[in-house]
């Protein structure tokens, strides 16, 4: 492998899988190459909370031995290593949700998606950093470390899943899993130049995903190409009887749609431009790249029309009532008695269970988690439930109906993913409302339960990535994969290669020499 490490890790996940099938490379060699990059990059990127190198090598060796005789029959992405957001439980590998309250917890079981990855022969490189309990938009709220954006290590990678996005962008992993509650896959995707997908709610099992807001959470792929995301989503998707919100049907034909889209023929497709998402609050560079991408869709034959989603302006307010309310309920289980952190009062003897719970939660939760628990508890309290939580759910229903009406007019909706490019560390930490505004364009899809995807749209005037978002009808995830793959191909053609050709990667220099 020697000095080929940098070349190998820059291959897409699909290309790495093809090399495994041909016998050009083994799964062990892929894992070793990425572990080298992780060792070199982590001092400056800090994407991983836990690197499970020994586990990944053991899984790779088992795969190589099993697949030695019949490589042609291998499933898609077989042998390709993957990184996992530390919000998804992994048997035998510490899982913390980036919180002190779960420090040292090693789950006795795997999430459904992890079982599927293992069945597909994908070794697990490690667990990636996030905002504590996936609550944040910058990955600055992790209890352990701050992840840096590979495009500018003085800037945030987005959140909550900045670890997975940065790991993929920095070539520490070819592909990763994240969770998306209000944009936690897509917004980091926009800020790091990666592809981030939130599947239809219920399209991927949530069994084994640590609950933040159960009616909004969704596991999805993080990758460098649209095809890689399609391949991964088909692997992890499908019905799971252990998840009561799981959709009964199997995965949609997303891989076929992505491959069809790469032909760059969008004749007959009607694309809706969400008129409420743009203008004030969106950086000029973001809007410029977005408009250029829309022009590319038109050049490929798509009909682009302006569409109104009338109640989308209320999304942020409704979300920040519904989500904290569910957080308040879900995080009540961390009480210091069943598992995780336990903190005693100074006397060493708690007067009551509530007394011990108070000390544990005070020490174990960070400021942003406490803020959301307080907000949610207030919204659910007697006398305020109908005025706050009940009203927010009514707004959510209106937004769901808005999307249904919009999709009667068009096949797919488009909007910028994030109103800005990556901001500097600390810039918004003291202003929660400014931080929350980062998700203004991603939250609506979570409230409506519809699938959405962010792909790179180029670099803004500040040299930082901009994201372009596709939103498709519920349970029609494949509809967004075709135009996304087409736009990806058209843009890369105009850039003379993928966006990461412009990324400076000093951690790759000299690898293997």
UniProtKB/Swiss-Prot annotation:
Highest rank taxon of the organism: Bacteria
UniProt keyword terms in alphabetical order: ATP-binding, Ligase, Nucleotide-binding, Protein biosynthesis
Membrane-crossing segments per the record: none
EC top class named in words: ligase
GO annotation terms (biological process): translation
Gene3D superfamilies found in the cross-reference section: Amidase signature (AS) domain
Keyword Mitochondrion: no
GO molecular function, one term: ATP binding
The EC number(s) this enzyme carries: 6.3.5.7
Active site (UniProt): 85 (charge relay system), 160 (charge relay system), 184 (acyl-ester intermediate)
Subunit structure: Heterotrimer of A, B and C subunits.
Function: Allows the formation of correctly charged Gln-tRNA(Gln) through the transamidation of misacylated Glu-tRNA(Gln) in organisms which lack glutaminyl-tRNA synthetase. The reaction takes place in the presence of glutamine and ATP through an activated gamma-phospho-Glu-tRNA(Gln).
NCBIfam families hit by this protein: gatA
Family statement: Belongs to the amidase family. GatA subfamily.
Record's protein name: Glutamyl-tRNA(Gln) amidotransferase subunit A
Organism listed in the record: Bifidobacterium longum (strain NCC 2705)
Gene behind this protein: gatA
